[in-house]
Amino acid sequence: MTDRTAAPSGPHIPVLLKPLLAAVAPVTGRWLDGTFGAGGYTKGLLAAGADQVIGVDRDPLAFEMAQPWAAEYGDRLVLQQGVFSRMDEYAQELDGVVLDLGVSSMQLDLAERGFSFMKEGPLDMRMSQDGPSAADLVAELSEVQLADVLYSFGEERASRRIAKAIVKERAQEPITTTLRLAEIIEGCLPRPKPGQSHPATRSFQALRIAVNGEYEELMGGLLAAERALKPGGLLAVVTFHSVEDRMVKRFFQHRANKTGNANRYAPAMEEQPSQFELVTRKAVGPDKDELAQNPRSRSALLRVGRRTDAAPVEITAKELSMPQLKETR
């Protein structure tokens, strides 16, 4: 059994850190890093001039691994275990919030966390190490429910075929490891051409999102940031796949009154106050230098908004284009 606190292979490189710091410059005051992970963004913000950073993570391992270096920042660094959708309970009047979505490199590199289809490990995928694991979902969901998860959360076109194969295989023997599940999925799909992603990529993404409630957490986090930021405060979000980016894009469009009129024949609606101004008009991706240094950045996109003094308002899952399982629609 691998030591659960062993350091991941290779240094952690925060994605899009340089363009993020450029977009939010000058960095001053108190910031919250809602996805602390290995501390890459937190270190970058502190080095850029933040007076204090509150590092939030649901994974207790993140703080165990930060112990060797966190103390050097003194009271400039505050660590808070929890979910970023509750950030407004941890702090108010923030000057900035950073969210780096999805699984962290630290979690991906530790085989025993069960996030990677490239390494043998228990089929876990829990970021907080609490609640049902991916193995539990694979064992307990019906074929229809599994297909719904794979299609809705992973945009997997072969979701029904894969779900059928999983149900067939689990009847023979429980599916409890990452490589066993990856092998089952590979058997359902054509061999990928050079440059194409691994056949299990979308299915593993879907299960991870379901296990951790990532879309609900993202929606809650965007709303919590709106409540926690002071006027002029900045919200920077880094996403890694199209669904996350679409949700963040829709949030900023909605809050900046940039959604447009869905029906050109309908009477114009009275413009509502804007909760955010767009800092990045379009999503910012990695440049060629970052791609060469960190291949994991290839799908990363950054969006940044600036908080106004307008009162926070609610938003629906539909308005955010948030995928929902059939049973919750």
Swiss-Prot record:
Predominant location category? cytoplasm
Q: Name one GO biological process term.
A: rRNA base methylation
Enzyme class name: transferase
Under Pfam families, the record lists: Methyltransf_5 (PF01795)
Gene Ontology cellular component list: cytoplasm
One GO MF term on file is: rRNA (cytosine-N4-)-methyltransferase activity
**Cross-referenced Gene3D superfamilies:** Putative methyltransferase TM0872, insert domain, Vaccinia Virus protein VP39
| UniProt keyword ATP-binding present | no
Does the entry feature the keyword Iron-sulfur, yes or no? Answer: no
User: What InterPro entries has UniProt attached to this entry?
Assistant: RsmH (IPR002903), SAM-dep_MeTrfase_MraW_recog (IPR023397), SAM-dependent_MTases_sf (IPR029063)
Q: Which reaction does it catalyse?
A: cytidine(1402) in 16S rRNA + S-adenosyl-L-methionine = N(4)-methylcytidine(1402) in 16S rRNA + S-adenosyl-L-homocysteine + H(+)
Residues binding S-adenosyl-L-methionine are G39, G40, Y41, D57, F84, D100, Q107
- EC assignment: 2.1.1.199
Ranges for region Disordered:
285-305
Keywords in UniProt for this one? Cytoplasm, Methyltransferase, rRNA processing, S-adenosyl-L-methionine, Transferase
Q: Any idea where this protein resides? A: Cytoplasm
Output the HAMAP family linked to this UniProt entry: 16SrRNA_methyltr_H
Q: What does this protein do?
A: Specifically methylates the N4 position of cytidine in position 1402 (C1402) of 16S rRNA.
Q: What NCBIfam families does UniProt report for this protein, alphabetically?
A: 16S rRNA (cytosine(1402)-N(4))-methyltransferase RsmH
Q: Tell me its family.
A: Belongs to the methyltransferase superfamily. RsmH family.
Protein name, UniProt field: Ribosomal RNA small subunit methyltransferase H
**Organism encoding this protein:** Ruegeria sp. (strain TM1040) (Silicibacter sp.)
Organismal lineage: Bacteria, Pseudomonadati, Pseudomonadota, Alphaproteobacteria, Rhodobacterales
